[in-house]
Curated annotation (Swiss-Prot):
Classification lineage: Bacteria, Pseudomonadati, Pseudomonadota, Gammaproteobacteria, Enterobacterales
Function, as annotated: Required for maturation of urease via the functional incorporation of the urease nickel metallocenter.
Organism: Blochmanniella pennsylvanica (strain BPEN)
Protein name, entry field: Urease accessory protein UreD
UniProt xrefs under InterPro entries: UreD (IPR002669)
Family the UniProt entry places it in: Belongs to the UreD family.
Subcellular location: Cytoplasm
Subunit structure: UreD, UreF and UreG form a complex that acts as a GTP-hydrolysis-dependent molecular chaperone, activating the urease apoprotein by helping to assemble the nickel containing metallocenter of UreC. The UreE protein probably delivers the nickel.
Molecular function GO terms recorded: nickel cation binding
Length: 278
């Protein structure tokens, strides 16, 4: 770790994980795995016929407090593919005045396939968090990614919100910016920005088309008792947004959408990660 990083995070813990994947002998393999602090690869499974690895990322402390930072840097070399997930939710606890930070960057060379499908992120009352996620997607590459954001603790009542959450998402395509967006939530605007709901979920997929958009919209409208959700197509980026108060229900919705679109985006039948079944 550099002196600059050490100085920047002297008030908290740094967890850093850098992964490279490459195609070797017909199998996508982890060719580089470098970690700093309590953040590492828990397990690599080869459950699929084409030898796509399912990789579980583990942060043993189970949560972040003010001053902590997690950095995930993933590179896929040409023609490789991987599914990345986590065994548990990312938890952001009450702040000591400092921000908890997560930084994700995914670099996809040509003709790769990435699925970044972690468990939810939970922002507890009085937490302060910054999350920055960037996808750099070269020509011919495919991505499905989702995340579910839970603001506050439903069991503690309606007034328990995070102090501040600042989330950046950047999707950079080979020939265009793709998508850039920012969500800022705090104690004062949480109810207004989320329409009274406590959970916001986002899924995006590249490349997509009108046929896939139609399937997702049909799926959303066919679900009984579903509260708020929608899907749109921004050039070749499918964007799905869901709101609700039941985290298990929304998680099932995300998994159902992923299961439906995977054959069209990734090009093969969906196979659930084992950890989703526990």
């Amino acid at each position: 770790m550099s002196d600059e990083l050490s100085q920047n995070f002297i008030d908290g813990w740094l967890g850093e994980l850098r992964l490279n994947f490459a195609l070797r002998g017909g199998r996508s393999v982890l060719t580089r795995c470098k970690h700093v602090g309590p953040f590492y690869v828990k397990k690599v499974f080869y459950s699929e016929n084409d030898n796509t690895p399912h990789v579980y990322l583990l942060h043993p402390p189970g949560g972040l407090v003010g001053g902590d930072k997690l950095v995930l840097d993933v590179k896929l070399e040409s023609d490789s593919r991987v599914l990345l997930t986590t065994p548990g939710a990312a938890k952001f606890y009450r702040s000591n005045g400092l921000y908890s930070e997560q930084k994700h960057i995914f670099r996809l060379e040509r003709n790769t396939a990435l699925e970044w499908v972690p468990q939810s992120s939970i922002f507890f009352p009085k937490s302060k968090a910054k999350i920055d996620t960037t996808f750099i997607i070269e020509q011919g590459s495919r991505v499905i990614s989702f995340d579910m954001l839970c603001f506050g603790n439903l069991s503690l009542g309606s007034s328990t919100y995070p102090e501040e959450v600042d989330i950046h998402l950047n999707i950079c395509l080979s020939d265009s910016i793709g998508l850039q967006e920012r969500l800022r939530i705090n104690e004062l605007n949480c109810v207004m920005k989320l329409g009274g709901f406590r959970i916001s979920a986002l899924l995006f997929a590249v490349p997509s088309d009108e046929k896939t958009l139609y399937k997702v919209r049909k799926l959303i409208t066919s679900v009984k008792h579903f509260q708020v959700g929608g899907a749109t197509l921004l050039d070749e980026i499918l964007v799905v947004r869901l709101l609700g108060n039941d985290n298990q229900y929304l998680k099932k919705m995300l998994h159902h959408i992923w299961y439906t679109i995977r054959p069209f985006i990734i090009g093969k039948k969906a196979m659930l990660p084992r950890i989703w079944l526990t």
